[in-house]
From Swiss-Prot:
It comes from Enterobacter sp. (strain 638). This is Chorismate synthase. The gene is aroC. GO terms for molecular function: chorismate synthase activity; FMN binding. It holds the Pfam family Chorismate_synt. GO terms for biological process: amino acid biosynthetic process; aromatic amino acid family biosynthetic process; chorismate biosynthetic process. Keywords: Amino-acid biosynthesis, Aromatic amino acid biosynthesis, FAD, Flavoprotein, FMN, Lyase, NADP. Its cofactor is FMNH2. Pathway: Metabolic intermediate biosynthesis; chorismate biosynthesis; chorismate from D-erythrose 4-phosphate and phosphoenolpyruvate: step 7/7. PROSITE patterns: CHORISMATE_SYNTHASE_1 (PS00787), CHORISMATE_SYNTHASE_2 (PS00788), CHORISMATE_SYNTHASE_3 (PS00789).
Length: 361
């Protein structure tokens, strides 16, 4: 099965299934000498892990990461870093009823069509449980980027259903279960989530992730543009159905005189491009938005077919998130960090001697 790796020089390969013994990943390309402990990775894993609030799946996994290789005496050795998280709270019996039934909106049907066989327990490899390893790998990238270049990567929920959320206070994001930066909307989100749980339904969301401090010059023309790689990484996250860089689809309604980011001796006057021009970072904030569909794992009855092709009614049992966008925040941060780390190493490999002729604002 191909498609389990991302990155060229900073390369992350994950393995494992939702109800398997463990999840794991191999991280190649980590520079030597970085101080690294399991605690450095655990913070973001705790932000992503299930069972931390009444608004997310009640599957309770400690998600304690183990560093198996690539670190000696608290420092990276430059060799492959092996990471492992054991699964401890599987309830595979919850999925016995769907062994021969395809859940609508899930990957059951497509995995069966592709492989002729599937692990039906919690979605197997297609489950968002896999993203725990991306978050662990992304934490390595985030630490390196912050220490070496002062880059800060942050994300937050910016819409749930029809409730738009402003980015007002980054400090608030870690103080509420929604990863929301808009204190005025938290009560509305709470009310919506309570209603969804009562109805047995779910809702979509938008997540915004921003990188501050990225220097100009990252990105490879033409097929490895920075924004193309970011979009690729974000689209690989479960339930993501759309990605915007900068103003995204809003540029359709703008004129060129409005959309272009004019430059003065003091710097750029706007950032409609989201910090990327011609596929290369401009030195401004990198801004990406992702749209996540509402999960199809709901108790509202729906129509589907079984393996015999017969029409059946489907009610999904198990433990699921009413809004998968909430826990997607640390995942999106991790994917942006992985892409930026990869492009930093690629830029250093080819253009280490280049001295930018223009100032960086």
């Amino acid at each position: 099965m191909a498609g389990n790796s991302i990155g060229q020089l900073f390369r992350v390969t994950t393995f494992g299934e939702s109800h398997g013994l463990a999840l794991g990943c191999i991280v190649d390309g980590v520079p030597p000498g970085i101080e690294l402990t399991e605690a450095d990775l655990q913070h973001d894993l705790d932000r992503r892990r299930p069972g931390t609030s009444r608004y997310t799946t009640q599957r309770r996994e400690p998600d304690q990461v183990k560093i198996l290789s690539g670190v000696f005496e608290g420092r990276t050795t430059g060799t492959s870093i092996g990471l492992l998280i054991e699964n401890t709270d599987q309830r595979s019996q919850d999925y016995g009823a769907i062994k021969d039934v395809f859940r609508p909106g899930h990957a059951d049907y497509t995995y069966e069509q592709k492989f002729g066989f599937r692990d039906y327990r919690g979605g197997g490899r297609s489950s968002a449980r896999e993203t725990a390893m991306r978050v662990a790998a992304g934490a390595i990238a985030k630490k390196y980027l912050a220490q070496k270049f002062g880059i800060v990567i942050r994300g937050c929920l910016t819409q749930m259903g029809d409730i738009p959320l402003a980015i007002k206070d980054w400090d608030l994001v870690e103080q509420n279960p929604f990863f929301c930066a808009d204190a005025d909307k938290i009560d509305a989100l709470d009310e919506l989530m309570r209603a969804l749980k009562k109805e047995g339904d779910s809702i979509g969301a938008k997540v915004t992730v921003i990188a501050d401090g990225v220097p100009p010059g990252l990105g490879e023309p033409v097929f490895d543009r920075l924004d193309a790689d970011i979009a690729h990484a974000m689209m690989s996250i479960n339930a993501v159905k759309g990605v915007e860089i900068g103003d995204g689809f809003e540029v359709v309604a703008l004129r060129g005189s409005q959309n272009r980011d004019e430059i003065t001796a003091q710097g750029f006057q706007s950032n409609h491009a989201g910090g990327i021009l011609g596929g290369i970072s401009s030195g401004q904030q990198i801004v990406a938005n992702i749209a996540l569909k509402p999960t199809s794992s709901i108790t509202v009855p729906g129509h589907t077919i079984n393996r015999a092709g017969e029409e059946v009614e489907m009610i999904t049992k198990g433990r699921h998130d009413p809004c998968v966008g909430i826990r997607a925040v640390p995942i999106a941060e991790a994917m942006l960090a992985i892409v930026l780390m990869d492009h930093f190493l690629r830029q250093r490999a080819q253009n280490a001697d280049v001295i930018p002729p223009l100032p960086r604002w």
